[in-house]
Amino acid sequence: MKEFFDALETCAPAEREAALMAALARHVAHAQAASPAMAGILAGVDAGTIASRAALARLPVTRKSELLARQQAARAAGGDVFGGFAAIVRGKAMRRAYASPGPIYEPEGTAANYWRTARALHAAGFRAGELVHNAFSYHMTPGAFIVEAGALALGCTVFPAGTGQTEQQLQAIAELRPDGYLGTPSFLRILVEKAQEAGADVRSLRKALVSGEACPPSLRDWLGERGIQAYQTYATADCGLIAYETAAREGLVLDEGVIVEIVRPGTGDPVAEGEVGEVVVTVLNPDYPLVRFGTGDLSAVLPGACPTGRTNTRIRGWLGRADQTAKVRGMFVHPGQVAEVLKRFPEVARARLVVSGAMANDRMTWRVEAAPAPGLAERFAEAVRDVTKLRGEVELVAPGSLPNDGKVIEDARSYQ
């Protein structure tokens, strides 16, 4: 059995980086030429100079909220439903269009393995000639189609089970005897538990590719005890495959078709290796050429290489959401404001705003990592008032003492 999907998975890291950076400059030029929205976002950028991670980090981050706002504005004006982000139009070049919550509309091009999920399926043990039970939703959103495209590219046959109708799904599994499952881990557990209650035979399921929600080790072990090896994948409707789990069970390996950065929430500034931050993705997809797309998800880079021999960077997986906006005394405070305050104090390593107290009696405390210095707390408090229009206490703490969890705003209020 072939262990790796292709030679890219084991190429030298320097070789991969050189290829990605060469592709990056071409991708930026294509985005400017083919995507009106990206052309506006990247106005004045010389694509030929965007050939390094440092250069990429100087470009603006486009977050999901901005993508939605641009689509809504375009639709209100009777324009492009995709808000100018798509580089393809209806017809032969666009196989399907989808609606994700918002709604945000996404196009699907015609390339085989369009979402690049065949790589994740291969790492999870799926192979040509197998039957897969796809329990992701086939209704409006692209979830089911994202993994189906990868399964078909591998040479698998797909049963489009969709969601719900547990009894009918159990009957189909018992009679069709699929080799593997695609869907959320929680629904797989429901199927297995219902099968045990009903005496249905689901023993043909030996592997699973799960996504859409967290799959804690306890659930993975529970499934393993019942003969199902479950592997996580990190994919979105905007980006396709971002990262996937391997047999090593040590984080998720990045896909070969994306450039991933981990940035401080609310900014576009890359964090140090190992520090938790927002996942920002540049998707090398000519049909939907996103550059520095902010997913809103938190993760961190894992040091070292995957024990399986795959040489691409690994991340820790999904660690929560980066959108930490809090409403304090009737005013919104967001991560971008925290970043703006920090920029005024180069001597401050990190800071966290902790909002505590009961509802209608909010208390703001800024925990600031810095060496003691005369007047620093007072100057920091003044900057906070200037940026947020709110008063708060400032507490200086030792460098490195704040948790490495990606949070810059912590809502610790009681909502009882």
Language model features with spans:
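Hydrophobic alpha-helical segments that mediate membrane insertion or helix-helix packing
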Residues: 100-101, 132, 151, 260
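Conserved AMP-binding loop of ANL adenylate-forming enzymes
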Residues: 122-158
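A glycine- and small-aliphatic-rich helix-loop capping segment at beta-alpha/alpha-beta transitions
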Residues: 115-116, 150-151, 250
